[in-house]
Amino acid sequence: MNTLSVLKGKRALWLLAAVVLTAIVTYIIEEFGLSAISLFEGGLLSMTPYALTAVGECINEKSGVVNIGLEGILAITAVTGVYGAELFDNGFLGLLVGALTGGFMGFVFGLVSVYGKADQTVAGTGINIFSIGFVQYLLMSIWGFPGIHILERRLMVRPIYTPIGQISIVTIFAIIVAGLAHVLLYKTVLGFRIRAAGESPQAVDVAGVRVDRIRTLSSTLGGALCGLGGAFMSLCWMGGVVKEISAGKGFIALACVVFAGLEPLLALAAALIFGFTGVFAFSVAVTPGVKEIIPFYFVNMVPYISTLIVVTIAIGRRRFPKASGVPYRRE
């Protein structure tokens, strides 16, 4: 059996699995009287922070920098996004503040890991731990309450109406960004340098290109997209901020990255899967006749269980850059 036959066989299996899954989901929707439009809208909302964060991290890791501090960046930028919206009296400017905050955090992470040669796992973990206390500090110092802050409805970034439901402008932007990231990485000189910095930084250095600058730029861009995802959660989705607003979304985004093998378009597809899985499970859990049987907290575990399964299956089958997570030292 040649390689082409194997690929065709795998595609047929994936197509069959997709058809079966679609049939099961359709049956459950009809059986429990769920709204397909509501599931669609909720799935896109849930998908957006995953997609933005995962696509940004794909670019980052292609350059050889691994940032596991996405959870902390999402939490902090969710707060700064709301603060920016109230400060400038504009939700879109709040999104910009969130993106800039995330970009700054990515830049600092780049300085620490690229120029400081710090262990990237430790640095990313530090961001996550730092965010736990810093988010509460921001909530208390800005609004005088450490747990929650509700945003005025007029400052929320409203979705646009389409024939298939309401869709956020940021969601559309996230889909476009995934395509642009693919073009950047595979169709431009900068993208070639980013990929080369992750595969063979010595060769890039010999060619006269600064590896440290390429990696820092990638880290900054990844942080900015993650920051936009954090601001999206508070300004476009939840209408406010709580101290646990990220709730593991940064780690799920990392699972999307692993599943995709650092490919932006596959990361977008993974984000769609995780987003719709969580919303679908929640919708079924609150349906009369089901919520009395299945504990609500058990259903809340579904996205995280699916994350563990996906990472376990995918991590051994994906190829990552040879210099991934390894600081480059010029000889």
Q: Where in the sequence are the language-model features?
A:
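Single transmembrane alpha-helix segments in multi-pass membrane proteins
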Residues: S38-F88, L95, F104-Q120, V258-L262
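Inter-helical junctions in multi-pass inner-membrane proteins, predominant
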Residues: F32-F40, L185, G222-V257, G289-V290
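Short loop segments and helix-boundary regions at transmembrane helix junctions
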Residues: N2-G9, K62-V66, M105-Y161, K187, ...
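Helix-loop-helix "hairpin" substructures at the membrane interface of multi-pass membrane proteins
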Residues: G165-V241, P264-L265
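Transmembrane helix-bundle core of multi-pass membrane transporters
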Residues: Q120, S131-K187, T216, G289-V299, ...
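Membrane-interfacial amphipathic/re-entrant helices at transmembrane-helix boundaries
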Residues: M1-L52, T80
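Hydrophobic alpha-helical transmembrane segments of polytopic membrane proteins
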Residues: F104-G106, G250-G278, I305-I313
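Cytosolic-side transmembrane-helix boundaries in multi-pass membrane proteins
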Residues: M1-A23, A181, E199-R213, V284-E331
